[in-house]
Amino acid sequence: MLSPRKVKYRKKQRGRLSGEAQKGNEISFGEYGLVSLETYFITARQIEAARVAMTRRVKRGGKVWIRIFPDVPYTKKPAETRMGKGKGGVDHWNAPVKLGTVMFEMAGVPRELAEAAMMLASSKLPVKTTFVVRRDLR
């Protein structure tokens, strides 16, 4: 699973996401993309599940790019622990995804296969998504 090798601060305050994506909102590498229609934190496990679903659907054909990275720590205290005694340990890593963010890209496969693979990956994610085609291919 994806996680940062080294971070400046091990734990972070939760914070909130708002607004639309100002960067990472255009297809840069591939021919097709999966774009978020909602703002949400996506876990490293969800990203990996979507990646596996996509690559299995295209059966070694084409190339897949993951455009989001889980670099925000999510802490959690152990079960049945009293309050206090400091902040809990890092439970997992999240990727902040805003509305309009291109999460995955794909190239080297027919459009129908790419769309089917992306929709399969979309079912593994907690956000509504849409399939997009690069502008110069339309």
From Swiss-Prot:
GO molecular function: rRNA binding; structural constituent of ribosome; tRNA binding
Stretches for region Disordered: 1-20
Keywords tagged on the record: Ribonucleoprotein, Ribosomal protein, RNA-binding, rRNA-binding, tRNA-binding
Signal sequence coordinates: none
Residues annotated as transmembrane: none
A single GO cellular-component term on record: cytosolic large ribosomal subunit
Pfam families for this protein: Ribosomal_L16
GO terms, biological process: translation
InterPro entries linked: Ribosomal_uL16, Ribosomal_uL16_bact-type, Ribosomal_uL16_CS, Ribosomal_uL16_dom, Ribosomal_uL16_sf
Basic residues: bias regions: 1-15
Described purpose of this protein according to its UniProt entry: Binds 23S rRNA and is also seen to make contacts with the A and possibly P site tRNAs.
Record-stated family: Belongs to the universal ribosomal protein uL16 family.
PANTHER family for the chain: 50S/60S RIBOSOMAL PROTEIN L16, LARGE RIBOSOMAL SUBUNIT PROTEIN UL16M
Subunit and interaction comment: Part of the 50S ribosomal subunit.
Protein name: Large ribosomal subunit protein uL16
UniProt source species: Borrelia turicatae (strain 91E135)
